[in-house]
Amino acid sequence: MNPPRRVALVTGGSRGIGRAVASTLAEQGWTVAFTWREREEEARRVAEELGDRGRPFRFDLRDRARAGDLVREVEEQVGPIAGLVNNAGVRRDGLLATLADDAWDDLIDANLGGVFRCCRAAVPRMLHRRQGSIVNVSSMTAVHGLGGQAAYGAAKAGILGLTRSLAREVGSRGVRVNAVIPGFVPTEMVADVPPDRVKALRSAEALPAGVTTTGVAGAIAFLLSDAAASITGQTLVVDAGLLA
């Protein structure tokens, strides 16, 4: 069991998978600092649900200077970060042949650069304390191509490479780094996916119940926990058998 008051930082924790992660970790005794970008009222409701186990912080993945300040503020106001969940992301579809450079750069910078900057801010502190666990949330598009998601898939595949290399860099000093690939999870982020594509994805799943936000959150909580103390540099797929 995790000791009380262990602190986790969850980016994108006000909705979808991130919200489920924040709730699951709080139930397991973690104190959760979670980030939000646009919807302050939504973040406030999550904080109320978590009670003294939750603290909201505003954060935009695209703000290159903000990650360092965020980590510093969390450690000063909440406590030393023992777990980092890089969950926040930006999805926008576009065919490669017509994708503008700015759109490509934005998706790569937000989805891969944001993870890089959060890791860069948190890792030195974890190394100093010789403990910490990082879970980076990727996507099935990293390993299973989907038309219109070349930039998004490239960024999410980059997260897997970052995860493996960083695990090698920091493992000798007690810090673990893993990734999770969620399958098709019915959240607001994928609300605009065409019904025929949703049907095709769901029909490819081996488990009829599909994937839920709480199911993904449980996998992330496991990787953060002491039960996963011997696991690093790995990718855990939570997809109801879609990629099997």
Locations of regions flagged by a protein language model:
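Conserved glycine-rich Rossmann-like NAD(P)H-binding loop of the short-chain dehydrogenase/reductase
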Residues: 28-44
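Substrate-binding pocket helix/loop in short-chain dehydrogenase/reductase
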Residues: 95-96, 103-108, 190, 201
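C-terminal substrate-recognition "lid" of short-chain dehydrogenase/reductases
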Residues: 116, 210-238, 243
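Active-site helix of classical SDR
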Residues: 119, 155, 163
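Alpha-helical segment proximal to the catalytic Tyr-Lys
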Residues: 124, 168-172, 229
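Conserved glycine-rich cofactor-binding loop
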Residues: 14-15
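Residue(s) in the substrate-gating loop at a strand-loop-helix junction
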Residues: 139
